[in-house]
């Protein structure tokens, strides 16, 4: 299984919804629905490619506006600022954001991926988590890779105080720092992680699929409250895309690449 294949697979157990009781009354319909697409969420890329949402809401004259997000923290920032109505994140990032007051509602599980690991260069002497002691490690704060790193350190009897964290804004920045030699390791995320494996020989020295959290679709709480009738329709389109992805893996892979 290739670097891309092993982390593109979508869990059959995904597609869970978290909708609770909602009001039967909704505010006036919105003029547009703003939703993210992300390379860490292949289902969103296929959803955008197939136009399922556009077809669903054409009869209501509701436009669909796609906004690219580059990380869970990016999507959560957009949701918190009201720049998008739906954003995809890792489950752990959504939980932390909600605890910290971000008004979001997690409504759907779109995948159970293995999208994060700890990465180093091909010639590095780092081979296990314990080797990170005293090393510089790049990460995006508050994302699944960051939480994955913290858990890995804990499992090895270390904490974040035993390393030198190098915080970056985007996951791609962390990968670039690693390849340039500015850091010793990187809490990576696909597809950037797979790209560096293929192009630069980067090594995934620590993997733990069970420590990767689910891919979650979140809605702005205000939007979910005001437009409760729209939420199930968005989820139906998402589920159609997810099921299509499972049945047409080669096509999903081409869209992803």
Stretch-by-stretch model annotation:
Residues 17-21:
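Hydrophobic membrane-targeting alpha-helices
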Residues 92, 165-166, 171-257:
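Pocket-lining segment of extracytoplasmic ligand-binding domains
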Residues 22-26:
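Sec/Tat signal peptide C-region and signal peptidase I cleavage site
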